[in-house]
Amino acid sequence: MRRFGFSGTALICLAGFAVLSLSGQDDKVVRGKYLVEEVARCQDCHTPKMDNGSFIKSQWMKGAAIGVTPAAPVQGWRPAAPDITPAGAVWKRWGDDGMTTFLETGKSPRGGKAGAPMPAYMLKRDDAEAIVAFLKSLQ
């Protein structure tokens, strides 16, 4: 019984340390989720929808047709929003740092701007990192 008590206590302590070490990252992911889904509403362009307008949850942030076209020509207009998950081509080209830089500066790692209708965000670094942490959690 004594052995089990010590082992159980050791496991609880180790689990507590694991939670403490992950809590900062978890907070960042939660904050990133809020920024992505409630503030910037990235899913409105980057997630495909069903005919009834609801999102296809299994395709969350995996890219979608924009669904609208401007009445007058808009330079750089993109008819589709790319997959912004780590599995997508953009992330594979840019990596974590490139995604963070894009959100901070509004420019790709090569200096290009996002095509319309994507706004050129210029976020604080901690906000950009939180968004990247959330998007990475979508793997």
Q: Predicted regions: what is each one?
A:
Residues M1-F4:
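N-terminal secretory signal peptides that target proteins for export/translocation
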Residues G8-A18:
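Bacterial N-terminal signal peptides
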Residues V19-E38, M50-F55:
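Electrostatic cytochrome c docking/interface patches
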Residues G32, V39-K49, I131, L135:
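The canonical Cys-X-X-Cys-His
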Residues A40, M61-G98, P119-A128:
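Electron-transfer interface patches adjacent to heme c in soluble/periplasmic c-type cytochromes
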Residues D96, R110, F134-L138:
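Ligand-binding pocket scaffold of soluble enzyme catalytic domains
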Residues T105-P109:
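Glycine-rich, acidic and aromatic/proline-enriched surface loops and short helix-turn segments
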Residues K113-P119:
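Surface-exposed aromatic
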